[in-house]
Amino acid sequence: MAKNKKEKKPNKILDFLWRNKKQRAKNCLCLLMIFIVLVSVTLGFVSSKLELITVDSENNNTIVDASEANKIYEEEEFEIIQALESASSYNDFINKWANNGGELRKSKNVLNVLLVGVDGDDGLENGGRSDSIILVSLNKKTQKIYMTSFFRDTWTYMNIGGSDRYNKLNASFFHGGDDALIDTIEKNFKIDIDYYVAVDFSSFTDIINALGGVTLEVEEYEANYINRTTVHTIEHGPAVNLNGYEALVYARIRHSDSDSDVSRTRRQRKVISALIDSAKGAGVSQLNSALDMLFKYVKTDLTKMEILSYGTQALASGWINYDIEQVVLSDPDIFRTGYVGGASVVFVDFPIVAEKVQTAIYGDSNVVNDENSKRAFSHLTLGSDGHYRAR
């Protein structure tokens, strides 16, 4: 999680913003749709737009100097985290892994932002459901943006208000809000998260409609699902334009695939990528309308000056042109679907997944899995119904 640091005065940010306003406004607003995934940021219409964002008042993070936007730092060395060698049960395994004190992987060349799509009557506060959980990692060294989806149904250890609990990953947000969700992901996947951006899904359809929809590939069975379950009729094909409602239904399709949550998270990432493409091709007035809708439904621990600072860096360094790479965690060797009680869950081999995610984002990992490592799945039993249960 972001640490408290000594405050630094930003350098020449506002001068940079207001130079060549008209062209810069469009570039800055296009950047928003990268930052809906990255830091939910825009630089155009600075004063009025930033006032719409809900900012976490407890954040004391440092303003980043835009003059260092292109600087590549030497990588630090990290203490090795050995995978577990013993555990008495699956819950004991994930408890020991989360609380082993392993050093979280981080880099000055990587910005990690947790994007949380929230559903529910209580919206961005406790009580909302984190329906979509995506870690967006901007790596200046590789000049890529990595998107890692976490299954919301992952059965995991979490600490809520000082009490040990075992539940689905998204329950940490429901019971403890942003801090609990970030703490749970950091401890289980051994990655330091710099910031979070929570977006209320109630804004989703209006934002996409304001941008003229999103264009993406739709498989025949996906189109059939939407046509069967809604009053809308869409075609299938390599480039289908979906309006906001259709895109939302598409992103939530879950029971049309044998792998359930795996394909669901894949579709969520596709919609986000398509949203970025729509923003890049939109006019300033379209983007302005989208921002007015979006920012009322955004909560973040970025301060307004940090937003300006990172946005300035993004323009100066061409972050908007970085390739987006999906970090796919669908390897059947690293997860199992099953039940805890009557609830459908995803069991994850956390040491293996943590190593894979770290390697994808940073190019290496401080997690070591070897022949002596205890596998989490040795504590699962396969039932006659083909589903796993923890023991």
Where are these regions (language model features)?
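Non-catalytic, solvent-exposed segments at the cell envelope interface
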Residues: 2-35, 41-391
